[in-house]
Every structure is written in structure tokens, then in C-alpha cells.
């Protein structure tokens, strides 16, 4: 039996070694099929990253499918049961790097649009694709640059589905209608280097920092809300000392991270951190990196369309969650867009033997098409 259109495109995409930020020709495959549907294609290359913006129609509302063609490295190939770039079906599961994150979703999007346009060639509004090869990497020259370009010419996305793997047990059981923000602090606490036998003429920055770090770790930053858990504070990295047992270090470097809800702002978190550090009389330098702001789509046409589409296909409404890490949805949401993440099961993403259920890909295609029916038919 021949492959379905979704499975055929998924296999073509998965056979290309598009390890971030490489695209390896994946976008060409998508563009070819979209051009045949009357999409106008705009390729945007920023340094080592390839992106494209495709649009069909010039009316509102503007609905966008967003995703990425890059994948994470495979890891040790000896731990894979199959070649990660030779898509293989075993017991109904499609194995390949990127099967779930997120080339499977990309195939579903394209085929869903093909079917929808065939049935509704004069559909309402406009359909677009925002695709990047820089989601798994530093995310500097990908979606965020395309969004900047669109905003500069006042081309604003109204509604967007990001194809990130949102599901847990079966496709569509969970959709993400928001994400927490991420704020990283790089803190250097300064002391005076010296001999451990003479602490009175040195100043140990590790000892000095510990009470402040303890307070930061136990502070309740907010209580969250109906959609988000309370803001969390974690220290993932800490480095100080020369490696010798008889030297008091002159500095200690601490990296900390907030995953924050819509109940807190960047300014509020930064101000409270500085207040705590100053209260403990530390000599320090502190630099901040805003990795992403929180977003939430708690109402609106898109949320209704997605929930109803999943219910139509699965005969069960999805659970709405905001858990997990960040995604490119955070950049699109800053346009004021309604953003929802709907994609395959995420159990094997970034792991060896990454896989996706073949039947789930067909269901996801149906869901995406039903969303278009609900919004633009």
C-alpha cells in the first residue's frame, strides 16, 4: 500500500539531516507544495539560518502555521535501533530524528492546507506559514527575526498554531494555550582571594553569597493563577575556586533562572533580586538575559476552533496546559497574536529512537484541516 500524502512528505523531510541550524533542503520541499497552492513565498536568510514566510490571500484574519525544520543532534548512533535519518516504520511507529519534533507536524500542516484549499479555493482571510531552521539552536536568527520583519511592515498575525509536540499519551489530548516566561541571571559575587589558613585577610565570596542564595531559593515570587503554576527560581550552574584546597576564591559565578507566570514581570523579578542581593551587602555584577516572555491565549476564536477540532477528531476535548519549556510561540505572541501549540506526543523528543505514531499523524492532519474549516471556510 502506498504512503498517504502526510506520511510521504514526513518521510521526505525526515530523510534530510537538518541538524540545527541546517535546513538541508527541507524548506524547499514545503515551498514546492505551497507554491502549487498559490502561496507567495518569501525566503529570509539571516546569517546561518534559513527561514521562509509563505502567504495565500491578502484579507483578514491572517492565520499562520509556525514550525521549524531543524532538529537536535542524534547523540550516540549505537543507541539507535534504526538510522535516525532513514525513516523507518516499526509496529505502527515512525522512527527518525525529528519525527515528533517537529517534521511530522510540518507534513500535517502542508497536507491539511492542500485539502482545505481544494475544498475552499476562495476561503476567508489568509493562510500563512512561518518556518525556521533555528528553533533548536540559539533562536537568534529564526522566528524572532521574521516576526521583526513582519512587524516593520505592519503585517500582523492574528492567529497561529505552532506544531510543537504538545500531546502526552495520544495526539490532541493536550494543547498548550500559553507558556511561562524565562529569565536568566548571570551573577558574579566578588571577594578577596587568599590562603584558607588566613581567612581574616581574605573574603570568601561563596560564603558571602550563600545567605542571599538561600533567600532567593525560598522566596515566593507569586502564587500563579488558573493557567500558570507559581514562578520558580532555580540555580543550574555555580562555579568558584581554583581547584586547590588551600585557596579562598576571589569570585564565584552563579547562573540562575526564573520560569515565570503572567503574575510577574521581568522588571519586578529583577528589582526583587537586586533588593535581596543589596540587603546582604554583596559586591557583585549582574547581567540579565530575557529568553522569552510569558503568553496566554485563554479566550478567542483560535482556542475555540482548536478545542472543537480536536473534539471532532478524537471525540474528546483536549486539556489546556502551559507546562514545559519555551517555544517560538513566545515571539509570535508579542505581536498580540492568539497562539496555540498543537502537535504529536512528546514522550521521545530529543531522545534516541525518537518516534511518532503513524495514525496520530493522520489524525493531526485532520485536526489542522478542521481548524481551518472552523475559522476560514
UniProtKB/Swiss-Prot annotation:
What EC number(s) are associated with this protein in UniProt? 3.5.1.18
For the ligand (Zn(2+) 2), the binding residues are 101, 136, 350
CDD domains recorded for this chain? M20_DapE_proteobac (cd03891)
A GO molecular-function term, please?
zinc ion binding
Which GO BP terms apply? diaminopimelate biosynthetic process; L-arginine biosynthetic process; lysine biosynthetic process via diaminopimelate
UniProt xrefs under InterPro entries: ArgE/DapE_CS, Bact_exopeptidase_dim_dom, DapE_proteobac, Peptidase_M20, Peptidase_M20_dimer, Peptidase_M20A
State which pathway it belongs to. Answer: Amino-acid biosynthesis; L-lysine biosynthesis via DAP pathway; LL-2,6-diaminopimelate from (S)-tetrahydrodipicolinate (succinylase route): step 3/3
Q: Which residues form a coiled coil?
A: none
Name of one Pfam family that matches: Peptidase_M20
Active-site residue list: 70, 135
Q: Where does Zn(2+) 1 bind?
A: 68, 101, 164
What are the required cofactors? Zn(2+); Co(2+)
Keyword tags: Amino-acid biosynthesis, Cobalt, Diaminopimelate biosynthesis, Hydrolase, Lysine biosynthesis, Metal-binding, Zinc
Known catalysed reaction(s)?
Answer: N-succinyl-(2S,6S)-2,6-diaminopimelate + H2O = (2S,6S)-2,6-diaminopimelate + succinate
Q: Cite the cofactor comment.
A: Binds 2 Zn(2+) or Co(2+) ions per subunit.
Q: Which PROSITE patterns match?
A: ARGE_DAPE_CPG2_2
Catalytic class of the enzyme: hydrolase
The record describes its quaternary structure and partners as: Homodimer.
* Known function: Catalyzes the hydrolysis of N-succinyl-L,L-diaminopimelic acid (SDAP), forming succinate and LL-2,6-diaminopimelate (DAP), an intermediate involved in the bacterial biosynthesis of lysine and meso-diaminopimelic acid, an essential component of bacterial cell walls.
In the record, the note on similarity to other proteins reads: Belongs to the peptidase M20A family. DapE subfamily.
Entry's HAMAP family? Answer: DapE
Q: What is this protein called?
A: Succinyl-diaminopimelate desuccinylase
Tell me which species this is from: Aliivibrio fischeri (strain ATCC 700601 / ES114)
Q: What gene codes for this chain?
A: dapE
Amino acid at each position: 500500500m502506498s504512503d498517504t500524502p502526510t506520511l510521504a512528505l514526513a518521510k521526505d523531510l525526515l530523510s534530510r539531516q537538518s541538524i540545527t541550524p541546517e535546513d538541508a533542503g527541507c524548506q524547499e520541499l514545503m515551498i514546492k507544495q505551497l507554491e502549487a497552492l498559490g502561496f507567495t513565498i518569501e525566503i529570509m536568510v539571516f546569517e546561518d539560518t534559513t527561514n521562509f514566510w509563505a502567504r495565500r490571500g491578502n484579507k483578514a484574519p491572517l492565520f499562520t502555521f509556525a514550525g521549524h525544520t531543524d532538529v537536535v543532534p542524534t547523540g550516540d548512533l549505537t543507541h539507535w535501533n534504526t538510522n535516525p535519518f532513514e525513516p523507518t516504520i516499526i509496529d505502527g511507529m515512525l522512527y527518525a530524528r525529528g519525527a515528533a519534533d517537529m517534521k511530522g507536524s510540518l507534513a500535517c500542516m502542508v497536507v491539511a492546507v492542500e485539502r482545505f484549499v481544494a475544498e475552499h479555493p476562495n476561503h476567508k482571510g489568509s493562510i500563512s506559514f512561518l518556518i525556521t531552521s533555528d528553533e533548536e539552536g540559539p533562536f537568534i536568527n529564526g522566528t524572532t527575526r521574521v516576526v521583526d520583519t513582519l512587524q516593520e511592515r505592519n503585517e500582523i498575525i492574528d492567529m497561529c498554531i505552532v506544531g510543537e509536540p504538545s500531546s502526552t499519551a495520544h495526539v490532541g489530548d493536550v494543547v498548550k494555550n500559553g507558556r511561562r516566561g524565562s529569565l536568566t541571571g548571570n551573577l558574579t559575587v566578588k571577594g578577596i582571594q587568599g590562603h584558607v589558613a588566613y581567612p581574616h585577610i581574605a573574603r570568601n565570596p561563596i560564603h558571602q553569597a550563600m545567605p542571599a542564595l538561600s533567600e532567593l531559593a525560598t522566596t515566593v515570587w507569586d502564587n500563579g493563577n488558573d493557567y500558570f503554576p507559581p514562578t520558580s527560581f532555580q540555580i543550574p550552574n555555580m562555579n568558584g575556586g581554583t581547584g586547590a584546597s588551600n585557596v579562598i576564591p576571589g569570585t564565584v559565578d552563579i547562573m540562575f533562572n526564573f520560569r515565570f507566570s503572567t503574575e510577574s514581570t521581568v522588571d519586578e523579578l529583577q528589582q526583587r533580586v537586586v533588593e535581596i542581593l543589596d540587603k546582604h551587602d554583596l559586591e557583585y555584577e549582574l547581567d540579565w538575559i530575557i529568553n522569552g516572555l510569558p503568553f496566554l491565549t485563554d479566550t478567542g476564536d483560535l482556542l475555540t476552533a482548536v478545542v472543537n477540532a480536536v473534539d471532532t477528531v478524537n471525540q474528546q476535548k483536549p486539556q489546556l496546559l502551559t507546562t514545559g519549556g519555551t517555544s517560538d510561540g513566545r515571539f509570535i505572541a508579542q505581536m498580540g497574536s492568539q497562539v496555540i501549540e498543537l502537535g504529536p506526543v512528546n514522550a521521545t523528543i530529543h531522545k534516541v529512537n525518537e518516534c511518532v505514531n503513524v495514525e496520530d499523524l493522520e489524525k493531526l492532519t485532520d485536526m489542522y484541516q478542521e481548524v481551518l474549516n472552523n475559522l476560514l471556510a
